[in-house]
């Protein structure tokens, strides 16, 4: 799809904030082409608007938080992944609290509501951020790299010293179908001992077996088990889609991540954006673009030079 898209109608959600434990209502509204994704803290007077962009990220501990002045919105990554995965470029997000509702811990409820609201195409072309040179960020044994590619792809290597998780690897070659079918329903997860510790420090107050996969000493304690055998790494990729969408444009490049998380995802986007020699922004015309949603671009032969 080469044209910017927004929602056909409004979509409203109410749910618990994972970390605050508060009930929050969020409404997605259509927006004009060129708007981007803009959050509005409508519970404040006056309301505060915050663009969903890497330059507005103020915290990456446990989730991704954007802010402006004293106002902020946290845990935006699942909603951002759903918007990106459903092809939504422009939307207003009215929210009456400091955190996006966790829903069931995945992006699936957001995806379903966006599908019900419908998608409206504009007449304005999208701009794609095409990676020209590799960019890498490292933090100890954690690493994230984005390299030139004909498609948007994320390859994730996850490693935990726990028998229920161990090592998991998976790749997503991005398309709307693959994201919605294989990744959107993957839930956030945590270790029981860590959840108890966080709650004692005023965090994860809304966490439960209804909105997260919880791992005990002997494995997953959720009665229904896992939705996918490798649900953990699928969720890490879902998080990455949401975090990387804060680049502000559709990406064309291959992300290779090892033990990455919200902080390293943000550092990768920030490092990429501050190195204009490593990417180019391209606005495609219908005549120049004849690929499906996964944005393979046969015209860009220079990527293989």
Swiss-Prot record:
This enzyme's EC code(s): 3.5.1.108
Residues that hold Zn(2+) according to the record: 78, 235, 239
Cystine pairings recorded for this chain: none
GO molecular function, one term: metal ion binding
Family listed: Belongs to the LpxC family.
Name of the protein described by the UniProt record: UDP-3-O-acyl-N-acetylglucosamine deacetylase
Active site: 262
Enzyme class: hydrolase
Gene: lpxC
